[in-house]
Amino acid sequence: MRFAVLFALALLGAHEYSLGQSTQSFTNPIIAGFYPDPSICRVGNDYYLVNSTFSYFPGITVFHSKDLVHWKLIGYVLNRPEQLNLDGQGVSRGLFAPAIRYRNGLFYVTCTLVDIGGNFVATSKNPAGPWSNPVWLPQINGIDPSLFFDDDGKAYIIYNSIPPDNKPLYNGHRTIRIREIDPESLRVKGDERVLINGGTNIEKKPVWIEAPHILKKDGAYYLIAAEGGTAGQHSEVVFKSVNVEGPYVSYQNNPILTQRQLNPKRAFAITSTGHADFVQTESGDWWAVFLGCRPYRPYEEEYYNTGRETFLAPVRWNDGWPIINPGHEEVQYRYLYPIHPSTDSIDIPTSGNFRSRDEFDSKELNLNWVCLRTPHEKWFDLMQKKGYLSMRLRPETCAGSMNPSFLGRRQQHLSGSASTALVFNPKAENEKAGLLIFQNEKHFYFLCKSTEGNEPVIQLYKSGSSGNSTSGMELIASSLIGKDQGENEVLLRIEAKEDKYSFSYTYDSGRWIVLKDSIDAKFLSTRVAGGFVGCMYAMYATSQEKESNSVAAYDWFEYSGDDEVYK
């Protein structure tokens, strides 16, 4: 499949961080859009990074980079239905907080499949895959597992778990625990130990200590973890010990990363930073990847539709303790490159402003496209109509809890657009195909072609159950387009401008017809919709709980991002 990058990323002129002699800077976030909970490892001069994917399939993104800045999606850990069944799972359930590690020619990814199987390990000799089926760890009671391989050959698994005796002292009281694990058989052994009870200072009732990782430096063990919850109070903290199993001492200057103390009205705010992982370059420098959020105006109200994104910042060691983002309070949109910039080609940028177009002219779907939950049958095809993505209409809907005919890619910018060209001849009013902007089952907008009284029509639906509703949607705008256009290709476009979406269509690409302008985008924000994901633009076709043999064919899909902060 050919993706043409039509507009390269533009870097903003903001604060710079002086590191070494380099004069080139990179743009944060390094992986924009809904790519949360990053974990990273280095093998030689190659870097690999994974993210949470919740109930999207394939599960657990695997990125590769040579310079920590330019990232290419190379595969998924769980890309076979027998590895991962997400039937019935809410969008913000599924796969939580993976961690990637490497030992003796083998990559390990640990993760939690919440509500279903619990914690597991998957392995592969090639990070691009294929990966093994999950090896389940029923003895590990908790979430956010991470492996640590010590110098003596022993391996440990660290995770977030229940309070001592499962008796919380306050809401949000959790522990960090450790158990030894056999790196060959992946069997847990030995006794469980509590490393951290509550957080940095239990007398102050710290909440949601989670996402632990252990690293070793100069003979000392460092445990880093997130604290404060994933919203505005999010932070990263560190503990230190001379023994891997503790006791651990909290750093007196914790947290080592947070934005919670800053003016919420500051322009182009980066908020909710935490859930970090460390990596050391070949030259010995340390860097941290972590999640953060970018609200749109008014910044202090914390509305964002792009989800939690992956950021990169330098780490400085001071008197035996690490500090993320040294010399700054605010996380920077620009830092100097950690490594000489790579010249490797990237088909789709992950940072800055860009435009990309998918022509659907390959035998395989580009890795950027994801399904909503696990597909159990073949419902899309790239060869049925050459140069088109053909999608069968099926009874499942995006408001349900199964796998609809839905192929999505992330909204990676506060301002931008998604557009597509659709060939579709609906045979009944329940048949609809088009372009979706989707947050979760109860928060989405659907711009589609359908039929009304035997006349072709362009419709805009909002998720909901009031008014003129069908299958979890409420009709908010429509336009009859005439039978002479019924079988012609129609172009559909959704434009995002921070807190507004606009919906347009055309049969002539030079003259867009606005169906509905300036619709509330806050309705799809994390603050309103809840959960842990960000918005997806999706090609979506449904027959709304009825059987159908109709097919929708998409000629191309174009995504464009144009955020002010990068200009």
What spans do the regions from the language model cover?
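Bacterial Sec-dependent N-terminal signal peptides
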Residues: M1-T23
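Carbohydrate-active catalytic/glycan-binding domains of CAZyme proteins
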Residues: L19-K567
